[in-house]
From Swiss-Prot:
InterPro entries: KH_dom, KH_dom-like_a/b, KH_dom_type_2, KH_sf_prok-type, Ribosomal_S3_C_sf, Ribosomal_uS3_bac-typ, Ribosomal_uS3_C, Ribosomal_uS3_CS. Keywords: Ribonucleoprotein, Ribosomal protein, RNA-binding, rRNA-binding. It comes from Dictyoglomus thermophilum (strain ATCC 35947 / DSM 3960 / H-6-12). This is Small ribosomal subunit protein uS3. Binds the lower part of the 30S subunit head. Binds mRNA in the 70S ribosome, positioning it for translation. Pfam families: KH_2, Ribosomal_S3_C. PROSITE patterns: KH_TYPE_2, RIBOSOMAL_S3. Part of the 30S ribosomal subunit. Forms a tight complex with proteins S10 and S14. Signal peptide: none annotated. HAMAP family: Ribosomal_uS3_B. Residues 39-108 form the KH type-2 domain. GO terms for biological process: translation. Belongs to the universal ribosomal protein uS3 family.
């Protein structure tokens, strides 16, 4: 059975960047890793309705944490006069015992963000909307927004079935094995009466232009046949080709 590797981890360092930027000695690594998890868990759990797509964490000093939150609804995080963002900062300072600086960035096209699309489908399933309808609506919105391909898969006890199964819909291209392809991936869970339903979304936005040009330049030249005189064709049965190694 063929299994699909994680599209994000597969492209780390090529088209995708790390979600955390810091270096630590071996003795401190595990504690900082748990701290990153606690920060992300606090934000996703308490501000799930804000449509948080990505949380970037950067540590430039031992006692400083810079957090960038990418969200579709920045107003819910900032609050009136910046009151809510200040409340978030104070809670994160208590959580980490470090100086915390929070920056909020708006996601311009939520329909093209795989994580937000997956969470939106999961929320609709929790509200007892038919999963097929939710999946097809998400696909249509993404294609109208400019996606070149999208695949959505739901797994679990769909419609309360006794046996769990997986169903998926796909439109356009999803070149998972092409490293220069800009593929966004998102995963969310819908908690229903029947059990947990997993939602996975792949969105293909096109190739990364710079990497695509480099890949074309690195390709070997095509085999070019030798120029053969007419009289040579009668003397030789085979035609030789020079192929650049």
């Amino acid at each position: 059975m063929g299994q699909k590797t994680h599209p994000y981890g597969f492209r780390l360092g090529i088209t995708k960047d790390w979600k955390s930027h810091w270096y630590a000695e071996r003795s401190d690594y595990s504690s900082l890793l748990h701290e990153d998890w606690a920060i992300r868990n606090y934000l996703k759990k308490n501000y799930y309705q804000a449509g948080i797509s990505l949380i970037e964490i950067e540590r430039k000093a031992a006692n400083r944490v810079d957090i960038t939150i990418h969200t579709a609804r920045p107003g819910m995080l900032i609050g009136r006069g910046g009151s809510e963002i200040e409340n978030i900062r104070k809670n994160l300072i208590k959580l980490t015992n470090k100086n915390v600086f929070v920056n909020v960035q708006e996601v311009k096209n939520p329909e093209l963000d795989a994580q937000l699309v997956a969470e939106n489908i999961a929320m609709q399933i929790e509200k007892r909307i038919n999963y097929k309808r939710a999946m097809k609506q998400a696909i249509n919105r993404a294609l109208r927004a400019g996606a070149k391909g999208i695949k959505v898969m739901c797994s679990g006890r769909l419609n309360g079935a006794e046996i769990a199964r997986s169903e998926w819909f796909r439109e356009g291209r999803i070149p998972l094995q092409t490293l220069t392809a800009d593929i966004d991936y998102g995963f969310a869970e819908a908690f229903t009466i029947s059990g947990v339903i997993g939602v996975k979304v792949w969105i293909y936005k096109g190739d990364v232009p710079e990497l695509h040009k480099e890949a074309i330049q690195e390709l070997p030249e095509k085999a070019v046949p030798k120029k053969i005189e007419d009289e040579d064709l009668y003397e030789k049965d085979e035609v030789n080709y020079d192929v650049d190694a």
